Amino acid sequence: MSIAWSCFVLGLFALASLQVALANDCAQKTFKTGIVCVCNITYCDEIPDINLLSGQAATFTTSKSGARLHRDVVYATNSDPLTSMHFTIDSSKTYQTIQGFGSTFSDASGANLKSLPDQMADTILRQYFSDSGLNLQFGRVPIASNDFSSRVYTYDDNLEDYNMAHFSLQREDYQWKIPYMQMAQKYNHDLKFFAVPWSAPGWLKTTNSTKGYGILLGTNQDTYHKSYVTYILHFLEEYQKNGILFWGLSTQNEPTSGSDKKTKMQSMGFTAEFQRDFIKLDIGPALKSSNAGKNVKILILDDNRGNLPKWADTVLNDKDAASYVSGIAVHSYQDDESDKHLTQTHNNHPDVFIFGTEASEGSKSKDVDYGSFDRAEDYVSDILDDFNNWVTGWTERNLVLDAQGGPSWVSGFADAPVIAFPALAQFYKQPMFYAIAHFSHFLKPGAVRIDHSLNMPNPEIERSAFLNPDGSKVVVLHNKNPLAPYSLSIKDTMKSTDHYQVHLSPKTIVTLYIQN
């Protein structure tokens, strides 16, 4: 082959490689607060392949300036680069196993998926649940309606139907939940679903309404409690008939809200003592003796971390109640509370996992903020804070919302990683989508957090490190500083001759992936 022909072939190969790289890029649209990536029926950006040989490493960068998981190969050096900041990872010292990331199959998510062409809905689910996308491992499923529904409904509104003879799934289940749960399973055959009620039917509550505050009528093992347990079991059974098995069940979403008279959404109040006894005497034994519930893990709390460790202590210090409990569910809305709440809870109950079951942005301002990098950074900070304090999983509040941040019957609008525009046959991927990807795409099921240290205090750089089952290592770094860049020398104690230099521009999220 002539030199000229060889150069021509190499040139074509380089051009093709460049075109492939560009084909994966974000189709940017700029708003006042930042950049979104626009997807339509023919195009949507993809996460670059890791594509590394043994011993190689790469960084994946997302920035306020517009990078979205931009891939750069990083070469190890035998000598320590000339930088003052040194970050060390040590995989010989491990902490909790990471169970994975998830999102919620809310009515609002299903309604928005349904509003788009089928091919686009499929694209969204592939980008969320396939291993080439966010690689989500969990799906949260509301039992009946919640604040992200278009209407208030339960599965049995027939007064005094204590045996739940008239229990019936609703159109929302058949149109907006089950079909998309099944589609997601196509991309992740090991997808785990966990269910949670916002309220019992109103006629089983002290206020005779699913909306607002109120508690479950009756006492343990009486007609009211048995009826409500039957209601939950029927839900699990009906979904099982549709091919959906549940990995977990939280006994109540935000139980402290149900005791607040200001609460407007569907809610039901539990104290820690009430939840302890409800698990021990009602739902726990019933699940164990049922076909649909015998393998379901019970999660307690499902509320903000400020309730810990006291709530967990109250439930789990009762040996009988604890025998039914697998996990402690936490929300992200009080993460200004000390992270010591999480670590103390783990120390008190090391055999019970802690799992993040709800996180969202925009719930206070009730809006969608197109291109907000601040909200992406909030997600990264929340995940790092959680994982550095023994949390094993993290769940987004909605898969997809509309331009207003809904639908929501109670106007409880919020932001989401994906925003649908059915009239344009488009959807936007918010920076929050990529923030989640910095963890979920790279951490494989069974990954463990490993020890890490920075040689000098720097609150502007948030970080954590992980070891995958295949031996690959993942370091996630977040430079919060809006002006100052940093350079880090990253050293793996298990390969003491290898040093990786990573540059952190201002307002940047970086994942370093080191192939085994």
Curated annotation (Swiss-Prot):
Residues 1-23 form the signal peptide. One of its GO terms (molecular function) is glucosylceramidase activity. One of its GO terms (biological process) is glucosylceramide catabolic process. Pfam families: Glyco_hydro_30 (PF02055), Glyco_hydro_30C (PF17189). Gene3D superfamilies: Glycosidases. The keyword Hydrolase applies. Pathway: Lipid metabolism; sphingolipid metabolism. Its EC number is 3.2.1.45. It catalyses: a beta-D-glucosylceramide + H2O = an N-acyl-sphingoid base + D-glucose; a beta-D-glucosyl-(1<->1')-N-acylsphing-4-enine + H2O = an N-acylsphing-4-enine + D-glucose; an N-acyl-1-beta-D-glucosyl-15-methylhexadecasphing-4-enine + H2O = an N-acyl-15-methylhexadecasphing-4-enine + D-glucose. It is an enzyme of class 3 (hydrolase). It comes from the Eukaryota. The active site is at 254 (proton donor), 358 (nucleophile). GO terms for cellular component: membrane. Keywords: Hydrolase, Lipid metabolism, Signal, Sphingolipid metabolism. Glucosylceramidase that catalyzes the hydrolysis of glucosylceramides into free ceramides and glucose. C.elegans contain specific sphingoid bases, which are unique or different in structure compared to the sphingoid bases found in other animals. Two examples of these distinctive compounds are: 15-methylhexadecasphinganine and 15-methylhexadecasphing-4-enine. Belongs to the glycosyl hydrolase 30 family. PANTHER family: GLUCOSYLCERAMIDASE, GLUCOSYLCERAMIDASE 2-RELATED. This is Putative glucosylceramidase 2. It comes from Caenorhabditis elegans. The lineage of its organism: Eukaryota, Metazoa, Ecdysozoa, Nematoda, Chromadorea. The gene is gba-2.
